[in-house]
């Protein structure tokens, strides 16, 4: 199979995350106009030579995505358990080739064997309903967050969506300091992928999870809550609503879940004791 380094790939627009196209506007169907579309391509995560999952994603920040996915899915517990990564072009997509520690790879293979022997229920690729909820250690209560500082974060979330500003087609995930300042953020066509990129970047730079919160531009699904909790995030802010299962998972793992985050507004679903009204 022909493979080449990511920086040599021509069909992902030098990893800008978007592609220029021609299209037609309603008021003028005779003359095409230039515009931009967000890139969405298959990205396979391959652990020690075995393909584990294929996700549709924006072809940017894929190493951070791989680290975040590995942590939030319980494949690893620490960044140091990944020994190396390469991003290569294959067929019509990309592979992130990840070298895992032997112990973690054995655990991943055991989990795959357990899933392969069951009758599938077809829920989002999970083999049985009981497998939807991953075991998450209850989070500690180590911090407080003044909601008066959230408005600043919301006003600047779009700063981390350059592709979104061009295309109107990406989700964002950013880290909010307790002061309300944003300390890094990522975008992707997939809301889960954007969050994984953020979680991966936090792990890459060795930052702790006890000083701040995650902010996402999307709704809060149970997967988003579970991913955040798996990495030790105590507070998750979402611009849109939360689902019932998200609230149940957040309650069970002691995560403070807040939805409908707009300037001057926030709806707290679980564990408000970490928050200061404002």
From Swiss-Prot:
Example of a GO biological process term: Mo-molybdopterin cofactor biosynthetic process
Keywords attached to this entry: Cytoplasm, Molybdenum cofactor biosynthesis
Keyword Ubl conjugation: no
Domain of life: Bacteria
Cellular localisation: Cytoplasm
GO cellular component assignments: cytoplasm
Pfam families noted in UniProt: FdhD-NarQ
MF GO annotations: sulfur carrier activity; sulfurtransferase activity
Main location (coarse class): cytoplasm
Binding site for Mo-bis(molybdopterin guanine dinucleotide): 260-265
List of catalytic residues: 121 (cysteine persulfide intermediate)
Keyword Cytoplasm appears in the UniProt entry: yes
Function, in words: Required for formate dehydrogenase (FDH) activity. Acts as a sulfur carrier protein that transfers sulfur from IscS to the molybdenum cofactor prior to its insertion into FDH.
Family named by the database record: Belongs to the FdhD family.
Protein name: Sulfur carrier protein FdhD
Protein's gene: fdhD
């Amino acid at each position: 199979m022909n493979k080449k380094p990511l920086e040599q790939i021509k069909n992902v627009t030098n990893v800008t995350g978007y592609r220029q196209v021609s299209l037609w506007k309603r008021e003028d169907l005779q003359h095409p106009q230039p515009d931009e579309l967000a890139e969405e391509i298959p990205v396979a995560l391959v652990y020690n030579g075995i393909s584990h999952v294929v996700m549709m994603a924006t072809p940017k920040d894929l190493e951070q995505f791989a680290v975040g996915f590995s942590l939030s899915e319980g494949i690893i517990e620490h960044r140091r358990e990944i020994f190396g990564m390469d991003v290569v072009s294959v067929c019509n997509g990309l592979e992130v080739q990840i070298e895992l520690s032997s112990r973690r790879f054995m655990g991943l293979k055991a989990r795959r064997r357990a899933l392969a022997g069951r009758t599938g229920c077809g829920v989002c690729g999970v083999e049985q309903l009981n497998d939807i909820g991953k075991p998450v250690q209850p989070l500690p209560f180590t911090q407080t967050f003044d909601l008066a500082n959230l408005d600043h974060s919301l006003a600047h979330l779009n700063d981390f969506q350059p592709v979104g500003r061009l295309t109107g087609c990406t989700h964002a995930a950013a880290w909010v300091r307790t002061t309300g300042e944003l300390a890094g953020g990522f975008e992707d066509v997939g809301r889960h992928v954007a969050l994984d990129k953020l979680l991966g970047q936090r792990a890459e730079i060795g930052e702790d999870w006890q000083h701040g919160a995650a902010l996402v531009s999307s709704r809060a699904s149970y997967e988003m809550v579970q991913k955040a909790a798996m990495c030790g995030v105590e507070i998750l802010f979402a611009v849109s609503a939360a689902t019932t299962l998200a609230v149940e998972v957040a309650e069970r793992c002691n995560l403070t879940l807040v939805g409908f985050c707009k300037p001057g507004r926030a709806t707290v679903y679980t564990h408000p004791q970490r928050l200061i009204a404002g």
